Amino acid sequence: LDTLQIELGYGLLSLADPKKGGDLLERVTGVRRTFVQEMGFIIPAVRLRDNLELQPNEYRFVFRGQLIATGEVMPGYWLAMNTNNSTEVLPGVQTTEPVFGLPATWITDVERKNAELAGYTVVDAASVMVTHFGETIKRTCYQILSRQDVQVLLDNLKDQNPALVNE
């Protein structure tokens, strides 16, 4: 049983396929690297896998066999979030951004420039997933941190501050 998995609907497989320009695994590795720097312990390797039971554009984050988060993205589209209270209404598919619960709109590449000029924050589908993954890991890291991880942290701290560890 893999500790952490990202399950992808078949419509999202291109996001993970380098031959099709997908860099999802590389981005997830970046999240893990950042997490080590910020939190001080290593997130276990993440396995990407397809899951034909999911809707085509659905993804799930699974930790030790338990679902911890789910979402849906639209590859080839851009998620526009009205973070500056713009009065501009964008044509597209209305949705809710999965991390912060903001109202958002999936827009085409043609609408992207208009959205940016109107003050919207615009991100691609893989960025939405990776941000969701990073925030989910931060929220659930207390479950991921093992006794062995704590021992490694203490051993490293002992080199720098032995008196603190002895207390």
Regions found by a protein language model. Name each.
Residues L1-E167:
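Membrane-embedded alpha-helical signal segments
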